[in-house]
Amino acid sequence: MKYIQKAILFAALAGAIAVFGGCGSTENQQPVTPAKTVTITDITGRQVEMPAVKKMAVVPLPWASVVYALDGNADRLGAIHPGAMSAYKGHFLEKMDSHFGQLDAKMIGQDFSIHAESLANAGIDSAVLWNYQEKDADKLKQIGIPTVMINNDSVDNLKKSFLIVGQMLGKEDRAKQLNAYYDHAYSEITAHKAEVEKADKPTILFLKN
């Protein structure tokens, strides 16, 4: 049951990003940056002073795609998780924005670790982290890179995180619209939940030597 709930959450997330990003994104669209420093309360309750974002690192998956959907392009992305690049190649985003394929995917590890000095040297001015990465947040703060933490372990936290990243980008209205798209996608998928639970499940035997 828990697996099905998580699968539904992420299926709805993927669907919302695909539809919302596709209808609101163009390669030539110019991002609108916040006019001044804003105070953001992230998912952990931390209050973060966030200057206008120009080049950001996005550690969690699939949040580089969320930033793309909110901003309309990849212009303010600077460093992404390697998994985000793997998801980009051969999929719809590759056809929509060639700049995404040029982003750095080495300064963030597969295990979500960060190379703080490399990020600073690359001109990264802000970062999105998972909610448990307090040590990484402190490390980046010490070198002048503010961070916000997000979480998508539940529908409520996911939608709050949309708004947090939207505020970070100065795209609060877009974040609210993305939440509406997500609600629609989630409702569409959960409408078939009973059918999925009743369906015959394959039995798989794992052998280990």
Describe the role of every protein-language-model region:
Residues 136-173:
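Charged, glycine-enriched surface loops/patches
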Residues 54, 74-77, 123-126, 143-146, ...:
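Loop/turn elements at helix/coil->beta-strand transitions in domains of secreted/extracellular proteins
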Residues 79-82, 128-131, 149-153, 172, ...:
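Short beta-strand->loop
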Residues 64-118, 126:
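A short, structured surface patch at a secondary-structure boundary
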Residues 62-65, 83-86, 126-136, 153-157, ...:
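Solvent-exposed loop/turn segments at secondary-structure junctions
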Residues 43-47, 113-121:
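Short, well-structured alpha-helical segments in soluble
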Residues 6-9, 22-66, 173-207:
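Bacterial Sec-exported substrate-binding components of ABC uptake systems
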Residues 17-20:
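Bacterial Sec-type N-terminal signal peptides, specifically the leucine/valine-rich hydrophobic h-region
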